[in-house]
Amino acid sequence: MTNIRKSHPLMKIVNNAFIDLPTPSNISSWWNFGSLLGICLILXILTGLFLAMHYTSDTTTAFSSVTHICXDVNYGWIIRYMHANGASMFFICLYMHVGRGMYYGSYTFLETWNIGVILLFTVMAAAFMGYVLPWGQMSFWGATVITNLLSAIPYIGTSLVEWIWGGFSVDKATLTRFFAFHFILPFIIAALAMVHLLFLHETGSNNPTGISSDTDKIPFHPYHTIKDILGALLLILTLMLLVLFAPDLLGDPDNYTPANPLNTPPHIKPEWYFLFAYAILRSIPNKLGGVLALVLSILILILMPLLHTSKQRSMMFRPLSQCLFWVLAADLLTXTWIGGQPVEHPYIIIGQLASIMYFLLILVLMPVTSMIENNFLKW
């Protein structure tokens, strides 16, 4: 008799994806982030579901309903902070996951990579709309500033913004629709993640060397399941340290003031995980130019396979490319810092230089360096 896990129609899918999946034997801990992202998504969906039971998406009661969750609902505070800080953990894992893909040349799996970029945009949209829901000062003004960027689109811009707002400013209609979208998006993300996995399993995983691992595969379970459990424990430990000891570390104090359309906060800024993109947006004095740079800063990932000029897939044996990769990482950290600073000297020029460096590194320096490395190896 065949094992039920190999014969049952549903179990068979699970078995081929998580148990008997042939996996390269040499994948490092950088390959843990996919499963960690899955955990973050499930955690956020579950906590979000319980928050939605007590939240009201009306401008008059939204802020007080969040206060009610924290003050009156049993364990409401921990659910709320696990949800908010869970989003931060999600983005840490996301950026590590994308960075891994760039370093080891995983973008040569075109379908997997492109679905991944779509996933990144979707998660960013969900996080942005979630930040609006508590209806604090930064929620309101963040929503106003970011949605207003669409007015830079020629001809249709103004109509588009008013259509998204559901009126002539960010108001009741905006909050209600943002709640609706914020509720549905994680399920769309989960569906996309399954497509992402489907495409990945068509080709099998990449590995640190970037060469075919068909000759050396091991079953996913128990080897990588136990490894993923270690990663998950570290993720949960970090999250709970944040939630229980510094729940507001990554938030903005302005969001503890109820939204007031008549009073603008001195420094409007998004959550920390959008600051690098916000810095790129602000570094261009023109509105449309800034919006284009903002979108391109993420959309540029789509071009990664086209910009790959090296004869080797991975950066493991390419020291010059490695240096540039870590310069890019430092550049993104610089811009994350700049995005949280006021628009004044010397932050303006640092932000502009960081933005130029970002595009220059990805579009010019890294492809040229790869060609130089090919020359060194006489390839």
From Swiss-Prot:
<feature type="transmembrane region" description="Helical">
    <location>
        <begin position="288"/>
        <end position="308"/>
    </location>
</feature>
<keyword id="KW-1133">Transmembrane helix</keyword>
<keyword id="KW-0830">Ubiquinone</keyword>
<feature type="transmembrane region" description="Helical">
    <location>
        <begin position="178"/>
        <end position="198"/>
    </location>
</feature>
<keyword id="KW-0812">Transmembrane</keyword>
<feature type="binding site" description="axial binding residue">
    <location>
        <position position="196"/>
    </location>
    <ligand>
        <name>heme b b566</name>
    </ligand>
</feature>
<dbReference type="InterPro" id="IPR027387">
    <property type="entry name" value="Cytb/b6-like_sf"/>
</dbReference>
<dbReference type="GO" id="GO:0046872">
    <property type="term" value="F:metal ion binding"/>
</dbReference>
<dbReference type="GO" id="GO:0045275">
    <property type="term" value="C:respiratory chain complex III"/>
</dbReference>
<dbReference type="InterPro" id="IPR016174">
    <property type="entry name" value="Di-haem_cyt_TM"/>
</dbReference>
<feature type="binding site">
    <location>
        <position position="201"/>
    </location>
    <ligand>
        <name>a ubiquinone</name>
    </ligand>
</feature>
<dbReference type="GO" id="GO:0008121">
    <property type="term" value="F:ubiquinol-cytochrome-c reductase activity"/>
</dbReference>
<feature type="transmembrane region" description="Helical">
    <location>
        <begin position="347"/>
        <end position="367"/>
    </location>
</feature>
<keyword id="KW-0679">Respiratory chain</keyword>
<comment type="subunit">
    <text>The cytochrome bc1 complex contains 11 subunits: 3 respiratory subunits (MT-CYB, CYC1 and UQCRFS1), 2 core proteins (UQCRC1 and UQCRC2) and 6 low-molecular weight proteins (UQCRH/QCR6, UQCRB/QCR7, UQCRQ/QCR8, UQCR10/QCR9, UQCR11/QCR10 and a cleavage product of UQCRFS1). This cytochrome bc1 complex then forms a dimer.</text>
</comment>
<keyword id="KW-0813">Transport</keyword>
<dbReference type="InterPro" id="IPR005798">
    <property type="entry name" value="Cyt_b/b6_C"/>
</dbReference>
<keyword id="KW-0349">Heme</keyword>
<dbReference type="GO" id="GO:0005743">
    <property type="term" value="C:mitochondrial inner membrane"/>
</dbReference>
<dbReference type="InterPro" id="IPR048260">
    <property type="entry name" value="Cytochrome_b_C_euk/bac"/>
</dbReference>
<protein>
    <recommendedName>
        <fullName>Cytochrome b</fullName>
    </recommendedName>
</protein>
<comment type="similarity">
    <text>Belongs to the cytochrome b family.</text>
</comment>
<feature type="transmembrane region" description="Helical">
    <location>
        <begin position="33"/>
        <end position="53"/>
    </location>
</feature>
<feature type="binding site" description="axial binding residue">
    <location>
        <position position="83"/>
    </location>
    <ligand>
        <name>heme b b562</name>
    </ligand>
</feature>
<feature type="binding site" description="axial binding residue">
    <location>
        <position position="97"/>
    </location>
    <ligand>
        <name>heme b b566</name>
    </ligand>
</feature>
<keyword id="KW-0408">Iron</keyword>
<keyword id="KW-0999">Mitochondrion inner membrane</keyword>
<keyword id="KW-0249">Electron transport</keyword>
<dbReference type="InterPro" id="IPR036150">
    <property type="entry name" value="Cyt_b/b6_C_sf"/>
</dbReference>
<keyword id="KW-0496">Mitochondrion</keyword>
<dbReference type="InterPro" id="IPR030689">
    <property type="entry name" value="Cytochrome_b"/>
</dbReference>
<feature type="transmembrane region" description="Helical">
    <location>
        <begin position="113"/>
        <end position="133"/>
    </location>
</feature>
<dbReference type="GO" id="GO:0006122">
    <property type="term" value="P:mitochondrial electron transport, ubiquinol to cytochrome c"/>
</dbReference>
<keyword id="KW-0479">Metal-binding</keyword>
<dbReference type="Pfam" id="PF00032">
    <property type="entry name" value="Cytochrom_B_C"/>
</dbReference>
<dbReference type="InterPro" id="IPR048259">
    <property type="entry name" value="Cytochrome_b_N_euk/bac"/>
</dbReference>
<dbReference type="Pfam" id="PF00033">
    <property type="entry name" value="Cytochrome_B"/>
</dbReference>
<comment type="function">
    <text>Component of the ubiquinol-cytochrome c reductase complex (complex III or cytochrome b-c1 complex) that is part of the mitochondrial respiratory chain. The b-c1 complex mediates electron transfer from ubiquinol to cytochrome c. Contributes to the generation of a proton gradient across the mitochondrial membrane that is then used for ATP synthesis.</text>
</comment>
<feature type="transmembrane region" description="Helical">
    <location>
        <begin position="226"/>
        <end position="246"/>
    </location>
</feature>
<keyword id="KW-0472">Membrane</keyword>
<feature type="transmembrane region" description="Helical">
    <location>
        <begin position="77"/>
        <end position="98"/>
    </location>
</feature>
<feature type="transmembrane region" description="Helical">
    <location>
        <begin position="320"/>
        <end position="340"/>
    </location>
</feature>
